[in-house]
């Protein structure tokens, strides 16, 4: 499952994976230079980040900051299909010297305790983020001209909710 760095012409990548079809049924430890949103489409898996293990079920998800080492594996006999969105920071703002990036995004992503977030539907603001990730998935399943603009919109909306709900 090696992912190559995103090119300068691509602002995000979407990949749907089945943990059972991966080598050794494992997403081996790795990190990415991009943000990642992970959404479990069906089943359950064990997800690891910062030496912590989480059981993630259908309808739940994760946010991973850039540079966070993470891995995943099967949990008991469960199958698991999940989607990963790798998002270039430029989706939020074209340059890091943008005042809005400096004011809202940089303090979050540079904070040492902000490595990841879990999203569960029982928390209202997290449920809303999960709904946005589902909408991103629907749009990517049936892309039409301009779909990248909708993805950009949802990513900005997600960061708005993260900014307003995460206390660092």
Show the residue positions of the predicted features.
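An amphipathic alpha-helical interaction segment
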Residues: 120-168
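Generic protein-terminus/edge-of-domain signal
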Residues: 1-61, 68, 102-103, 113-116
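A hydrophobic/aromatic-rich effector-binding and dimerization subdomain
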Residues: 1-13, 73-137
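Residues embedded in well-ordered beta-strands
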Residues: 36-38, 84, 157
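Residue-level recognition of conserved beta-strand edge/terminus positions
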Residues: 65-67, 73
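Hydrophobic aliphatic residues
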Residues: 16-18, 109, 162
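A conserved hydrophobic position in a structured secondary element of the catalytic/binding core
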Residues: 64-65, 87
């Amino acid at each position: 499952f090696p992912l190559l760095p995103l090119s300068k012409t691509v602002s995000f990548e979407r990949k749907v994976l089945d943990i059972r079809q991966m080598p050794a049924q494992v997403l081996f430890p790795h990190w990415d230079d991009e943000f990642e949103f992970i959404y479990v489409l069906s089943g359950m898996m064990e997800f690891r980040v910062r030496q912590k293990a989480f059981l993630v079920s259908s309808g739940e998800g994760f946010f991973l900051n850039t540079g966070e080492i993470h891995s995943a594996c099967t949990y008991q006999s469960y199958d698991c299909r999940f989607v990963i969105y790798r998002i270039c920071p430029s989706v939020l703002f074209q340059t890091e010297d943008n005042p809005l990036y400096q004011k809202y995004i940089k303090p979050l992503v540079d904070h040492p305790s902000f490595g990841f977030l879990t999203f569960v539907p029982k928390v209202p603001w997290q449920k809303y983020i999960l709904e946005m990730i589902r909408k991103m998935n629907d749009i990517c399943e049936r892309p039409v001209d301009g779909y990248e603009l909708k993805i950009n919109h949802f990513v900005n909306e997600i960061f708005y909710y993260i900014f307003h709900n995460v206390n660092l």
